[in-house]
A protein has these predicted regions:
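S-adenosylmethionine
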Residues: 1-182
């Protein structure tokens, strides 16, 4: 397979041509995960360390969470939250394939799980050293790759995404330990 380093991410590999990912050597053995180059940068910027407690607030499909686990050398704790339990099944399938042992899934909307200052789930009761919040977005940034999206976006849907992002930021910031990073 002809491949080379990506232009920005220090951990990325770019294939010379497209192919079936699941047929690539090492895929089934969990030696890599396919992710956009920009997505690879986020876990690197969070500067996680082995032994830390980390929250991946909008986790599915799990690429960033499994990357965090690798950076943590599979030591510590990652709580992966997503609104859709079916999407968390995909996160856990990726964890099994990649050998991630430190991730615990939690299905639910963080805005409801944390609420108005009341943490309603024991996995969220202790503060986190690091929090990754890749909040759901409008998708406007990928219109070049998915131009059909312009037919589905409305000013109202964009405003709803913005409001959700603000609410998620407010909720996750309350879960961060003093001196932690979000």
């Amino acid at each position: 397979v002809e491949a080379g380093p990506t232009s920005i991410s220090e951990v990325g590999i770019q294939l010379a041509r497209s192919c079936s990912v699941i047929d690539l050597p090492g895929y089934a053995e969990g030696r890599f995960y396919v992710e956009d180059e920009a997505g690879q940068l986020i876990p690197l910027l969070l500067d996680v360390q082995p032994g830390q407690r980390v929250l991946d607030a909008c986790s599915a499909p799990g690429g960033k969470a499994t990357h965090l686990a690798a950076l943590m050398e599979n030591r510590g704790e990652i709580v992966a939250v997503d609104r859709a339990s079916a999407r968390l099944d995909l996160v856990m399938a990726n964890c099994r394939r990649l050998g991630v042992k430190i991730l615990t899934p939690l299905a639910g909307d963080l805005r409801a799980l944390v609420g108005a200052g009341i943490v309603s789930h024991p996995m969220l009761s202790r503060p986190f050293d690091r929090i990754l919040l890749d909040a759901p977005c409008s998708g406007l940034g990928v219109l070049r790759r998915h131009p059909e999206g312009k037919w589905y976006k409305t000013p109202e849907s964009i405003a709803q995404h913005r409001q959700m992002q603000v609410e998620l930021l407010a909720v996750t910031s309350r879960l961060l330990r003093p001196g932690g990073e979000l």
